[in-house]
Amino acid sequence: MANVFDNSSYRDMLKMVFVIRDDLKMTKGEIVSQCCHGAISAYEKSKKYSPDYLKRWLKNGQVKETVKVDNENEMMDIRENATAIGVNYYIVQNDKRQKCNTVLVIGPAPNYMFESLTRSLKPL
């Protein structure tokens, strides 16, 4: 069976991470909907701001990961750190009137860039 990944090291492989607020107690369907919206928006944003990462991510299996945070403050701290290191991100809001931030999508970016951002978070 052929390997879909090239010979890049794990550290340099790319992924997209979905940081999901656990305090909102969203249903599985709501989480899927929010993550799908975020994936498309992060993809579109990546075409402009990080096209090389996007091309590599598409070529190497489009790895995705979901993690959870306890609250919005924790999610926004991660967003600030992503901004500081230059990682693409997109924040999903469930209702434009209420502007409730539900999911932070980060990437695509190399694994090593996530070490300081999401390593300590639990998978969803």
UniProtKB/Swiss-Prot annotation:
Keyword Hydrolase: yes
Alphabetized SUPFAM superfamilies for the sequence: Peptidyl-tRNA hydrolase II
EC number of the protein: 3.1.1.29
Reactions performed catalytically: an N-acyl-L-alpha-aminoacyl-tRNA + H2O = an N-acyl-L-amino acid + a tRNA + H(+)
Keyword Hydrolase among record annotations: yes
Record-linked Gene3D superfamilies: Bit1 (3.40.1490.10)
Keywords recorded for this protein, A-Z: Hydrolase
Pfam families, A to Z: PTH2 (PF01981)
InterPro entries recorded: Pep_tRNA_hydro_II_dom_sf, PTH2
GO molecular function, one term: peptidyl-tRNA hydrolase activity
Family named by the database record: Belongs to the PTH2 family.
Record's protein name: Putative peptidyl-tRNA hydrolase
Organism of provenance: Fowlpox virus (strain NVSL)
